[in-house]
């Protein structure tokens, strides 16, 4: 059985382009972070890139949460 939150997310994925774009961006950034963090050695530039990706990922998560709050 799906929670109300999951049902709302499914609804927004179909109806709200801004939410869909934020979720797609969040997923893409998560994949990029996974790839970067799997490296056996991180250069200082890699570490900076990881911090930037994490901030962007958090911003997209915040955007999704703001949209969810509007529909609750």
What positions do the PLM features span?
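Extended, charge-rich alpha-helical interface modules
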Residues: 1-72
């Amino acid at each position: 059985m799906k929670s109300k939150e999951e049902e709302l997310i499914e609804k927004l994925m179909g109806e709200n382009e801004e939410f869909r774009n934020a979720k797609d961006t969040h997923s893409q950034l998560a994949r990029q972070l996974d790839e970067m963090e799997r490296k056996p050695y991180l250069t200082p530039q890699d570490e900076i890139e990881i911090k930037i990706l994490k901030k962007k990922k958090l911003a997209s998560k915040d955007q999704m949460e703001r949209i969810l709050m509007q529909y609750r």
